[in-house]
């Protein structure tokens, strides 16, 4: 009996092992080199332990193969992925061969029935739907429209200063949480600009908006578990769909959108004139043109909201980190800002006239890219060369991983890559040159470049102008000294958080 039991157990274990490794020869059969995958975790050894950020696993592979191949085959658990090693090939994926890599991988994991809001975000949309939605949204994010809401930016900047001054009066040995402060700023900004409502983020009794935003972005285990299941058993992706926007968060924003729409329509019906042509105004016009209900209006408005909250706050917090660590850079920036101030504020047109500020933004994005990698989906098979290896075909449906972090932290392209050196971006068209080489894609590239890039940049610059012109930024001892990323986060951030000591000038 014992022998029979052991035999059955051995057969089951053997069968399970065979199932788990059955396609690990996928890339070898196609002549594509790459590291040997490990059971369950594939080429992401920290998938389960989360001892370090996943991008470091990819960086190890990148450095192992960068001088030999343009791309190598890897596995996310059992799912084959093509890891792009050559930045020139990365640019082909985003630009010249865009039609072959049109969609983002997440599109195959999102279903409109289970996650209507995120499924209708341009990031998730595919094919003609993406093209139509982007064409609809783009006119709402022109520089002209961003300029009309700039007075809101100045108003929120004033609230930011008042909040910081209050924190300084209260005092804390841990200093100020830079991410929390930045998220208060972006939540207040975006809520007013997009919905015409106040979030009261800087008050003692904020509305639930910011907590709902935190609920939206602070769910790493949801995505890790989903990734593990669908990567280990790819067929499950047809049965299990990822829900990025939790039900309660969607319900909250649907109600909020309804309230914003009713309020604005009532104001317009009463004959109230608005000095600004804001994003809500544009969404309402689009709604009438497309005959959209509140849920559909929210799907459009969430495009503006998602691009403006978390990623913008993350970049802002890390700029303050870098300036706090680099006193000379902070002083140079303060000098540049003060030379353009008028009555304590800066004109909208002058924001683009601050080259050192722009360089600080770009260099921070290089060091702490919010989008540390892009997972593209091959939408049309294509043959590509591979340096020392033979040409091979990337088949339709293959996931193609572009590791932006690896390029931007490579000493070959950026000497002394871990150091904050804004001067890298002071050369004429430096960012454009780096982008065309494929080594710097802070906002992506090609037709699917980040649609909220200009709005986010204006927010970030305005906040930095406000803070650096009025406060000296120092790093609290609670903040780590290196640039190690927090494991398991959707958007990269310094491990342990960023804590600042601010001094009023």
Curated annotation (Swiss-Prot):
Superkingdom to which the source organism belongs:
Eukaryota
Q: Per UniProt, what is one GO molecular function of this protein? A: monooxygenase activity
Q: How does it sit in the membrane?
A: Peripheral membrane protein
Where along the chain is heme bound? 450
Q: In the record, which residues are listed under signal peptide?
A: none
Disulfide bond positions: none
Gene3D superfamilies, sorted: Cytochrome P450
Report if keyword Oxidoreductase is assigned: yes
- Which keywords does the record carry? Endoplasmic reticulum, Heme, Iron, Membrane, Metal-binding, Microsome, Monooxygenase, Oxidoreductase
Xref: InterPro entries? Cyt_P450 (IPR001128), Cyt_P450_CS (IPR017972), Cyt_P450_E_grp-IV (IPR002403), Cyt_P450_sf (IPR036396), Insect_CytP450_Detox (IPR050476)
Annotated GO CC locations? endoplasmic reticulum membrane
Cofactor field: heme
Annotated family:
Belongs to the cytochrome P450 family.
**This protein's name:** Probable cytochrome P450 28a5
């Amino acid at each position: 009996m014992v022998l029979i039991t052991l035999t059955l157990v051995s057969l089951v274990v053997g069968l399970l092992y065979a199932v788990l490794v059955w396609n690990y020869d996928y890339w070898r059969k196609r002549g594509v080199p790459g590291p040997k995958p490990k059971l369950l975790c594939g080429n992401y050894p920290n998938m389960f332990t989360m001892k370090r950020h996943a991008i470091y696993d990819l960086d190890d592979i990148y450095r192992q193969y960068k001088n030999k191949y343009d791309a190598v085959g890897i596995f996310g658990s059992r799912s084959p992925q093509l890891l792009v090693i050559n930045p020139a090939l990365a640019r082909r994926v985003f630009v010249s061969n865009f039609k072959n890599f049109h969609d983002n991988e997440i599109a195959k994991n999102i279903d409109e029935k289970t996650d209507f809001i995120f499924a209708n975000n341009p990031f998730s949309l595919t094919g003609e739907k993406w093209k139509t939605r982007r064409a609809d949204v783009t006119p709402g994010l022109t520089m002209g429209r961003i300029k009309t809401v700039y007075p809101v930016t100045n108003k929120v900047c004033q609230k930011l200063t008042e909040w910081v001054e209050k924190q300084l009066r209260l005092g804390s040995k841990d200093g100020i949480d830079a991410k929390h402060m930045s998220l208060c700023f972006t939540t207040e900004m975006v809520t007013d600009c997009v919905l015409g409502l106040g979030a009261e983020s800087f008050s003692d009794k904020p509305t639930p908006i910011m907590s709902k935003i935190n609920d939206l972005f602070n769910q790493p285990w949801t995505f890790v578990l989903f990734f593990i299941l669908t990567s280990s058993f790819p067929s499950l992706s047809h049965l299990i769909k990822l829900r990025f926007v939790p039900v309660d968060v969607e319900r909250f924003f649907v109600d909020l959108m309804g309230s914003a729409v009713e309020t604005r329509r009532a104001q317009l019906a009463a004959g109230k004139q608005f000095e600004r042509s804001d994003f809500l105004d544009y969404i309402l016009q689009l709604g009438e043109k497309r005959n959209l209900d509140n849920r559909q209006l929210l799907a459009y408005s969430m495009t503006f909201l998602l691009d403006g909250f978390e990623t913008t706050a993350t970049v802002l917090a890390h700029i303050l980190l870098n300036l706090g660590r680099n006193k000379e850079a902070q002083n140079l920036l303060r000098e540049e800002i003060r030379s353009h101030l008028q009555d304590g504020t800066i004109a909208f047109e002058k924001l683009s006239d601050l080259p050192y500020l722009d360089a600080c933004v770009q260099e921070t994005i290089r060091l702490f890219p919010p989008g540390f990698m892009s997972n593209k989906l091959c939408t049309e098979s294509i043959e590509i060369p591979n340096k020392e290896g033979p040409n091979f075909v990337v088949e339709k449906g293959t996931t193609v991983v572009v590791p932006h972090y690896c390029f931007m932290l490579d000493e070959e392209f950026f000497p002394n890559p871990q150091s904050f050196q804004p001067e890298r971006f002071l050369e004429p068209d430096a960012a454009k040159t780096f982008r065309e080489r494929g080594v710097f894609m802070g906002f992506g590239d090609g037709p699917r470049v980040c649609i909220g890039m200009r709005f986010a940049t204006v927010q970030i610059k305005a906040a930095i102008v406000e803070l650096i012109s009025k406060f000296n930024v120092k790093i609290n001892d609670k903040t780590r000294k290196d640039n190690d990323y927090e494991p398991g986060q959707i958007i990269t951030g310094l491990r342990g958080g960023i804590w600042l000591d601010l001094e009023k000038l």
